[in-house]
A protein has these predicted regions:
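Active-site glycine- and acidic-residue-rich loops that bind
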Residues: 184-187, 251-262
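Conserved strand-turn element in the central/C-terminal portion of the radical SAM core barrel
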Residues: 211-215, 219-222, 235-257, 281-283
């Protein structure tokens, strides 16, 4: 068993084997305190084999579990463009302050804040169980999406290496797949994905909503930064794989200026992204509290504005969303993007107890279903040419 020497209460280190993807900062609470090393987990996690810590993942505990099943059926009536998902990890050390999968961690008796970032459940037998499930005569080979709830290429994947087995199992069974991630560790699996694309439709999406490195480091501290993700998009395109981008969330007053949007869409076009969907920050319960604490600490002058803009709900005002959709359309056109693509791992929860597990109408302005074709899944028309629109720059609504 991996990390045998690092089980809690026996914290030896296997640094060489750890993921090379280094986070820019450690897990931080919104009050600015670095997360303390967690106490040994004594939670009644189903299938828990053991809990592991290591200094290379300071403050993070991995709970290795054996899963009975890894294929999740999306709730009936969902607006998501796929029926099945796999989440090899629960919780995510990418630690995005705005992550709206946070609430799902409470179903495991963890909290939606620091625990989501630092108590990561790892389904160590995911590939093996998946092969069994895919071999059932009843399996109809519908598309399976990875990255719908938490990031499958978060840092732990460098160590646990669950994704290669999952990709192989899906492709070998003739099941189309799509992946959404912020993790540059995906580059490791490009050859495998290229091969899989000769067997089944394969879609790849990168989540990137800002080019400001400093802002990214503050709001998504465990992720590879924007430059690294842009490089990943280029590598995917060079490998002949399509690469859509989820430009969500656009953060009011922080990443929604014309300069920021121009830089974002221009950079995505230059990197060769095949499509992009963009939308405003969505603050569902569990995320809202965490994000508002962060805003109050990092940008206290914006705290009141955010409160008024969201009015205690999950969505920015209709007026703001309409304004942002217009700016997005303008800058997409300027940089040659047509239409939109994809889905977001921030945009769906898998737990049936969550009534908001359904893709919330209007939460993804302009988004469209992924349309698969062999080797082109997830792509939409990006002409790559800067179709310059002459629309004058609109002023932000004055409401806020
Ligand atoms: S938004 Fe995605 S990458 Fe960020 S913490 Fe959530 S699941 Fe991880």
């Amino acid at each position: 068993m991996r990390w045998d020497a690092q089980a809690l209460n026996a914290q030896a280190v296997d640094a060489e084997a750890l993921n090379a993807e280094t986070p820019r900062t450690g897990t931080q609470a919104p009050d600015g305190q670095t997360a303390p090393l967690p106490a040994p987990a004594l939670l009644p996690l189903a299938g828990l084999v053991r809990s592991v810590t290591t200094p290379e993942f300071a403050g993070v505990t991995f709970h290795e579990v054996t899963a009975k099943s890894v294929l999740n059926k999306v709730a009936a009536g969902s607006r998501m463009p796929f029926e099945w998902t796999i989440n090899p990890y629960r919780g995510c050390s990418h630690a995005c302050v705005y992550c709206f999968a946070r609430k799902t961690h409470t179903y495991l008796d963890f909290d939606a804040g620091l625990d989501f970032d630092s108590q990561v459940v790892v389904k160590v037998n995911a590939a093996e169980v998946l092969r069994r499930e895919l071999a059932k005569p009843s399996w109809q080979r519908h598309q399976v999406a990875l990255g719908t709830n938490t990031d499958p290429y978060q840092r732990a994947e460098g160590r646990y290496q669950l994704m290669p087995g999952i990709i192989r199992a899906l492709a070998d069974s003739g099941t189309p797949l799509s992946i959404l991630t912020k993790g540059t560790l995906l580059a490791r699996d490009i050859p495998l994905l290229k091969h899989a694309a000769t067997q089944v439709p394969v879609g790849v999406g990168i989540s990137l909503a800002m080019t400001d490195e400093q802002l990214s480091e503050a709001v998504e501290p465990g992720t590879p930064g924007p430059r690294a993700r842009l490089k990943l998009i280029s590598r995917l395109r060079e490998a002949g794989l399509p690469c859509g981008v989820m430009a969500m969330p656009i953060l009011p007053w922080l990443s929604d200026s014309d300069e920021a949007l121009d830089s974002l869409f221009g950079s995505l076009a230059a990197a060769g992204a095949t499509g992009v969907s963009a939308g405003a920050l969505y603050l569902k319960p569990g995320t809202r509290e965490w994000f508002m604490q962060w805003i109050a600490r990092e940008h206290p002058q914006l705290a009141g504005k955010y409160r008024r803009l969201y009015g205690g709900g999950s969505y920015a005002s209709k007026e703001y969303r309409a304004w942002l959709a217009g700016r997005v359309r303008f800058f997409k056109a300027r940089h040659g993007f047509i239409g939109s693509t994809g889905f977001s791992h921030e945009d769906i929860d898998q737990d049936p107890r969550d009534e908001e597990a359904r893709y919330p109408a209007g939460s993804l302005p302009g988004s469209a279903r992924i349309r698969h074709g062999r080797g082109t899944a997830g792509s939409v028309g990006h002409s790559g040419t800067g179709e310059s629109a002459a629309e004058p720059v609109a002023a932000q609504p004055t409401l806020f």
